[in-house]
């Protein structure tokens, strides 16, 4: 009997405890990171930005704090280096949206952009620079985590000539391609490396027979990052330790940056069969797997 009474008492206590619990209210509202439209850009521009967000869940921002867009400081030589992004005037937002469409977004399919090809935040800036304390280094873009900052939103944008615009396209797409690889959005087909000998270093391709033998082994030149002139990436023992990476990079630079006319010298040479095979492997792979037309990118000169 005592056990029955004890059980009833415990049950009654539990019921009382439950009845005195505070009721759970509605969950806190999750606020968006940014509110669109942001400011006084044209209605058309704000509508385009809203459409980008609705499609890709990515913010294109022209009204922001510098720290929000990009703020990194590093110690160097006892000083502090700070990256800065300067906002542009909102009257140039329309032209800037056209600009990023022309040099970047048009080359990637919607499904790819939805999966992360469009970074979560894209900041439109007048200019971007590294403040070293004693001077500034200007940049046309910076990739910062899952954000991209693009400079140029100023009066010079609408007057940009075709040569400059092509250079900006090549710079930005090179950076974004590396970003996509790092994020796992793109990869490299193993078939590209299959028939190339990366074990036995060739003779230095300085000129003449050595250069021809080097080409027949399937290697292209690269481009000087400052002058833009073609040069051989294999100039000694060290670059050969990264032969695979250098080989792929040289092909991708030609594929993305050069027109059909500019690459005819190796595509039309019957002696360069391996170069042509590797070339077509990359074109076919990215078109089939990602619907990215590398030759459309290379042939776009504005």
Named regions from a protein language model:
Residues 199-302:
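Metalloprotease/metallohydrolase-associated module, dominated by Zn2+-dependent proteases
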Residues 86-97, 143, 161-170:
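Solvent-exposed, acidic/flexible segments
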Residues 131-166, 278-299:
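Structured domain cores in non-transmembrane regions
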Residues 94-146:
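Auxiliary, metal-adjacent structural segments of Zn-dependent hydrolase domains
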Residues 14-17:
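C-terminal motif of bacterial Sec signal peptides marking the signal peptidase cleavage site
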Residues 19-111, 266-302:
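Acidic/polar, low-complexity intrinsically disordered N-terminal segments immediately downstream
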Residues 148-197:
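Active-site recognition of the HExxH zinc-binding catalytic motif
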Residues 1-4:
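Positively charged n-region of N-terminal signal peptides that target proteins for export
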């Amino acid at each position: 009997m005592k056990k029955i009474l004890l059980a009833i008492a415990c049950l009654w206590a539990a019921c009382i405890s439950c009845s005195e619990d505070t009721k759970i209210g509605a969950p806190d509202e999750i606020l968006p990171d940014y509110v669109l439209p942001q400011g006084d850009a044209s209605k058309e521009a704000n509508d385009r930005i809203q459409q980008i967000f609705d499609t890709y869940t990515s913010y294109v921002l022209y009204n922001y704090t510098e720290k929000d867009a990009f703020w990194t400081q590093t110690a160097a030589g006892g000083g502090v280096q700070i990256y800065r992004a300067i906002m542009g005037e909102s009257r140039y937002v329309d032209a800037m949206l056209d600009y990023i469409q022309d040099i970047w977004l048009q080359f990637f399919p919607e499904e790819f952009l939805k999966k992360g090809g469009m970074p979560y935040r894209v900041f439109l800036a007048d200019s971007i620079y590294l403040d070293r304390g004693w001077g500034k280094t200007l940049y046309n873009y910076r990739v910062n985590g899952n954000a991209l900052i693009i400079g140029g939103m100023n009066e010079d944008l609408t007057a940009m000539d075709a040569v400059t615009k092509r250079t900006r396209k090549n710079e930005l797409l090179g950076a974004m391609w590396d970003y996509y690889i790092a994020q796992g959005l793109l990869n490299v087909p193993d078939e590209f490396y299959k028939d190339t000998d990366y074990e036995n270093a060739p003779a230095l391709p300085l000129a003449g027979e050595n250069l021809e033998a080097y080409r027949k082994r399937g290697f292209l030149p690269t481009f000087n990052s400052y002058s833009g002139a073609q040069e051989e990436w294999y100039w000694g023992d060290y670059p050969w330790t990264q032969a695979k990476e250098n080989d792929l990079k040289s092909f991708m630079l030609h594929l993305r940056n050069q027109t059909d006319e500019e690459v005819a010298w190796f595509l039309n040479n019957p002696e360069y069969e391996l170069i042509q095979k590797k070339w077509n492997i990359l074109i076919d792979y990215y078109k089939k797997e990602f619907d990215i037309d590398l030759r459309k990118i290379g042939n776009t000169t504005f």
